[in-house]
Amino acid sequence: METEVFHLSETNPDVRITAYLAGTYERIPHNEKRPAILIFPGGGYAYCSSREAEPIAHEFIAHGYNAFVFDYSVNGAAVYPTQLIEASLAMKFLRDNAEKLRIDPERIFTIGFSAGGHLAAMLGTMWHKNFIYDAIDMPYGYNKPTGMILCYPVITSGKYTHRGSFDTLLGDGKNDKKLLREVSLEYAVTKKTVPTFIWHTRADKTVPVINSILFAEALSKKNIPYELHIYPDGWHGMTLCREFLDAENEYIGDWVRCAEHWMKNTK
């Protein structure tokens, strides 16, 4: 496996992609061009969680993907829509460098955890917004993922919100009702939203499961393909459900197998 770091911002060195690339071997020719997964760690927009970064990359490398961890602006370094523009820039980077990175530019999925799930969902619902193309010179749809995986995502700024995520994302605009609705993603779903895989635990006390339910309901209303898994027990931030990360839970950890199957069948 090869790793390499690519910096995407001239003003913020913390905005970067860490690439995890499978080696190329004569007897494994498919490694020369793998599907890709772009990973958005959580952390309430205050930091990027290491538990939702490299371990996720290693997991998906083992399942046949080349993986890319995306560190975006956090902790007040920027406010919305900067993170969405950065995510679009990350997608552009992968497609611009698909040959070098040994990935299929038509098979790039995103995965986000908690607040990283919010960013992934913003990209998956708002990739077509004009302000993104005003900021980045690229063809229409160049930043559009093939599909998105949302793991215990922050979605709503309403009654069931994770308030801290929105406070940090919006900064001085945190009480602006128009902005709050704009980033409350159950309202952002349109016919242009990408196919979605979601998982959450019913017992999550940090980001209530209603976040995922509201998003799934919005997807249903627009007839967007999706798969939703709600596990009865467990807590926020279970990632891969492995003991070395937090706690072993084979049942919930099966989400990885389910997501892999979903990706293989998503066009």
Which residue ranges define each predicted feature?
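N-terminal cap/lid segment of alpha/beta-hydrolase-fold proteins
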Residues: M1-E32, R163
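C-terminal catalytic histidine-bearing segment of alpha/beta-hydrolase fold enzymes
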Residues: N12, I213-K267
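Short beta-strand element of the alpha/beta-hydrolase
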Residues: K33-G42
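Catalytic nucleophile-loop/oxyanion-hole region of alpha/beta-hydrolase
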Residues: C48-S50, F68-P105, A247-Y251
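Short amphipathic alpha-helix adjacent to the substrate-entry channel of hydrolases
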Residues: S50-F68
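Primarily recognizes the serine-hydrolase "nucleophile elbow" in alpha/beta-hydrolase
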Residues: K92-R163, L180
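Acidic catalytic loop of the alpha/beta-hydrolase fold
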Residues: S157, A203-V207
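Short beta-strand/loop motif that positions the catalytic acidic residue
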Residues: K192, I198-H200, D204
